[in-house]
């Protein structure tokens, strides 16, 4: 395709048209633009403007391109019901002259007889020339990017704990707060407790599951709430009156202080409960009721009911007859200590770990335990809000691994303890799939958690695609096949990956791919009815159902897989926006642009993966195109050979040694490999000693 030196990308944002020029019942937002591109030609010695191409009808706030040539004129006509209202004429050369280098520029285009149009323009170079109609290169924002130039971090909204209609989120309280359930002070330097997003009730993390009353700010009326009302009939309203508190007092709902000198809040005449004026309508009808005792009683009854229903008759008889007392002395004292609350330290756990290995390992001797002193820190491979990933060497073995270092305080502050254990579980499970990064061992210090994983020195696909802009179809198909095998393995084990992207697909020394970073993974054990609800992922790869706040399943991974395939084939993202709002709007509403350089089979595969209905998306059972492995894009693929890693890779990364880090970004590898110490000793002291019990693990199935 021939190339032109200059091109102009335009986006019409809005029009300012005087009211007297608008037809009856029409506003400026009702006007529709029509674009004519005219060229100057010589006819019998006279210059005339001739329109050689069809009229374009671009949408507002959608990008479109046109090549710039000498004498070419752009005519924009704003119409209402096919009737012209105002028009503007401008030389394309004048438009690009106002652009600032390669940056996006906003300009006003004057219209006749009056008014103006706000447009966003950008000067492009090496665009298709005039041999191609303007409408052929008309694009939406999905084709407005210059290519993949940056690494994009994942986002995760705060985890919401829904209890009786309350939406509790871990919260950092800048001022002293008391728990509205147990009335105790909420200690801590980070996120000391949970606060409901609807009614602002504040509780300890340990108390949030004990809340028994329905959230007054929620419209929900769950079965549990109805059952609770039927059982306890708790509906005793308070008798509040304005009160002058003579000493510092805290609200029994939101937990914060009642400020002021006079009439700071309300107090119940019967039970002396205090609250802000603004919290009165949110106070539960629990006058004279001890919520903590009532909650304990309710949960005790609930536990007793479940225990009786679930225990087999012989087990129930053992409890009733007291026969279990015969075995009281058979439980080793060391094992009993595991169930006692004690101050945790890394050193004290070593003996317990070895003892547990003997018990569960069949007495064949303890599995070797690893700690930070066993490794030399060599280079930084990557960084994030969680901490770092470093290249390390196992001392005396000449073995190299990738060590992921997670800050304990950051994990606790973001309420991500459960996610850390899920990541550990998936890494252990990865030994059963050749396309997942394996765990070598995990351990901890007082400040950090460590995952030691196999070192994939081929680098990630983001690094390689930045070198050559895009992959050919054969190479893309190879990577896609191995990714499909990996995803289907995870889905078979009821795991949603949720963070598939170029950065997380790494190459080993032979050129085979492996998925890494399972910090966003979700297992069925912590999902509602097999569905997840957390808003998380990398913005460019997030599926429409996540953006809409709907419950979702494994289909989100196939949407991300479609974005990944598009980036490999085209060399840029399928959806674009200047900010997250524009990007998400593009994902929800726009159709990706498929260039002519990709095959029909690839375009058909991408279209099926970009199905906004998750049930019929390619990869899901209800997809009308059938199973993903039988799609025409994968015609001729021997899936058995792929599953066994028997297909030779089309590309082998250049690796000089086992410790070579040349396939990783210099921005990271040039940094000094060191852990950032936590200097705040009070912060370390506030960490729950039992938050990361039994985290240490050595994988007996690890294979290099």
UniProtKB/Swiss-Prot annotation:
Disruption phenotype: Up-regulation of nlp-29 is severely impaired in the hyp7 and vulva epidermal cells following fungal infection by D.coniospora or physical injury.
One Pfam family from the record: C1_1
Zinc finger (Phorbol-ester/DAG-type): 165-215, 237-287
GO terms under biological process: antibacterial innate immune response; defense response to fungus; intracellular signal transduction; peptidyl-serine phosphorylation; positive regulation of antimicrobial peptide production; positive regulation of axon regeneration; positive regulation of gene expression; positive regulation of MAPK cascade
Reaction(s) the record says it catalyses: L-seryl-[protein] + ATP = O-phospho-L-seryl-[protein] + ADP + H(+); L-threonyl-[protein] + ATP = O-phospho-L-threonyl-[protein] + ADP + H(+)
Active site residues of this protein: 499
Keywords: ATP-binding, Kinase, Metal-binding, Nucleotide-binding, Phosphoprotein, Repeat, Serine/threonine-protein kinase, Transferase, Zinc, Zinc-finger
Effect the entry attributes to changing residue 404 to R: Probable loss of kinase activity. Loss of mlk-1 phosphorylation
GO molecular function, one term: diacylglycerol-dependent serine/threonine kinase activity
Enzyme class, UniProt record, top EC level: transferase
Boundaries of every Protein kinase domain copy: 375-634
Modified residues (Phosphothreonine): 89, 139, 324
Binding positions for ATP per the UniProt entry: 381-389, 404
Database matches in PANTHER family: RIBOSOMAL PROTEIN S6 KINASE
Protein's job: Diacylglycerol (DAG)-dependent serine/threonine-protein kinase that phosphorylates a range of cellular proteins. Phosphorylates mlk-1, a component of the JNK pathway. Involved in axon regeneration after injury probably by activating the JNK pathway. Plays a role in resistance to fungal infection and in wound healing by promoting expression of antimicrobial peptide nlp-29 in the epidermis downstream of gpa-12 and plc-3 and upstream of tir-1-p38-like pathway.
Record protein name field: Protein kinase C-like 1
Organism: Caenorhabditis elegans
Gene of this entry: tpa-1
């Amino acid at each position: 395709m021939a190339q032109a030196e200059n091109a102009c990308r335009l986006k019409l944002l809005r029009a300012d048209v005087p009211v007297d020029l608008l037809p009856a019942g029409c506003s400026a937002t009702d006007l529709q633009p029509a674009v004519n591109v005219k060229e100057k030609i010589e006819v019998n010695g006279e210059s005339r403007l001739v329109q050689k191409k069809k009229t374009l009808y671009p949408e507002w706030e959608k990008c479109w391109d046109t090549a710039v040539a000498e004498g070419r004129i752009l005519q924009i006509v704003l119409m209402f019901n096919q009737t012209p209202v105002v028009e503007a004429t401008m030389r394309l050369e004048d438009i690009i002259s106002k652009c600032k280098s390669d940056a996006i520029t906003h300009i006003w285009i004057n219209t006749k007889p009056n008014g103006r149009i706000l447009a966003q323009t950008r000067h492009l170079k090496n665009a298709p020339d005039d041999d191609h109609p303007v409408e052929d290169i008309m694009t939406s924002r999905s084709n407005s990017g210059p290519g993949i130039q940056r690494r994009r971090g994942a986002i995760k909204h705060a985890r919401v704990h829904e209890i009786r209609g309350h939406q509790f989120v871990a919260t950092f309280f800048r001022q002293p707060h008391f728990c509205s359930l147990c009335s105790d002070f909420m200690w801590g330097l980070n996120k000391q407790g949970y606060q409901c997003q609807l009614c602002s009730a504040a509780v300890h993390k340990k108390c949030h599951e004990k809340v028994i009353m329905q959230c007054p700010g929620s419209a929900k009326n769950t079965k549990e709430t109805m059952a609770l009302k039927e059982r306890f009939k708790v509906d005793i309203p308070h008798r509040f009156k304005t009160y002058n508190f003579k000493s510092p007092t805290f609200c029994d709902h939101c937990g914060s202080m009642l400020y002021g000198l006079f009439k700071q809040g309300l107090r119940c005449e019967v039970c002396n409960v205090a609250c802000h004026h603004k919290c009165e309508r949110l106070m539960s009808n629990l006058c004279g009721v001890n919520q903590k005792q009532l909650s304990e009683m309710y949960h005790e009854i609930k536990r007793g009911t479940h225990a009786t229903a679930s225990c087999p008759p012989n087990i129930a008889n053992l409890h009733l007859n007291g026969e279990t007392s015969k075995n009281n002395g058979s439980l080793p004292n060391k094992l009993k200590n595991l169930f006692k609350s004690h101050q945790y330290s890394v050193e004290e756990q070593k003996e317990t770990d070895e003892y547990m290995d003997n018990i569960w390992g069949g007495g064949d001797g303890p599995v070797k335990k690893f700690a930070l002193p066993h490794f030399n820190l060599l280079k930084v491979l990557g960084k994030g809000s969680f901490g770092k990933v470093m290249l390390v060497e196992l001392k005396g073995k000449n073995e190299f691994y990738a060590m992921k270092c997670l800050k304990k305080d950051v994990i606790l502050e973001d309420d991500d303890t459960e996610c850390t254990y899920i990541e550990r579980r998936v890494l252990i499970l990865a030994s059963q799939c050749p396309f997942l990064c394996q765990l070598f061992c995990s351990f901890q210090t007082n400040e950090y958690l460590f995952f030691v994983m196999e070192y994939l020195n081929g680098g990630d696909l983001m690094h390689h695609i930045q070198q050559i802009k895009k992959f050919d179809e054969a190479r893309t198909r190879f990577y896609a096949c191995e990714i499909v095998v990996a995803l289907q393995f995870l889905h078979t084990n009821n795991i949603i990956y949720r963070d598939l992207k170029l950065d997380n697909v790494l190459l080993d020394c032979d050129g085979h791919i492996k998925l890494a970073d399972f910090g966003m993974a979700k297992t069925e054990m912590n999902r509602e009815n097999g569905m997840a609800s957390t808003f998380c992922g990398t913005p460019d790869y997030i599926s429409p159902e996540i953006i809409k706040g709907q419950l979702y399943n494994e289909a989100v991974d196939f949407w991300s897989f479609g974005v990944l395939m598009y980036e490999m084939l085209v060399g840029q993202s399928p959806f674009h926006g200047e900010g997250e709002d524009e990007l998400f709007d593009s994902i929800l509403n726009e159709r990706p642009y498929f260039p002519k350089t990709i095959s029909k089979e690839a375009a058909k595969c991408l279209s099926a993966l970009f199905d906004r209905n998750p049930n019929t998306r390619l990869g899901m059972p209800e997809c009308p195109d059938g199973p993903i492995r039988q799609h025409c894009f994968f015609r001729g693929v021997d899936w058995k050979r792929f599953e066994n890693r028997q297909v030779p890779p089309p590309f082998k990364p250049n690796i000089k040694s086992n410790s070579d880090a040349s396939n990783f970004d210099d921005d990271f590898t040039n940094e000094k490999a060191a852990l950032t110490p936590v200097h705040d000793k009070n912060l370390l002291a506030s960490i729950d000693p039992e938050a990361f019990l039994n985290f240490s693990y050595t994988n007996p199935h690890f294979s290099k």
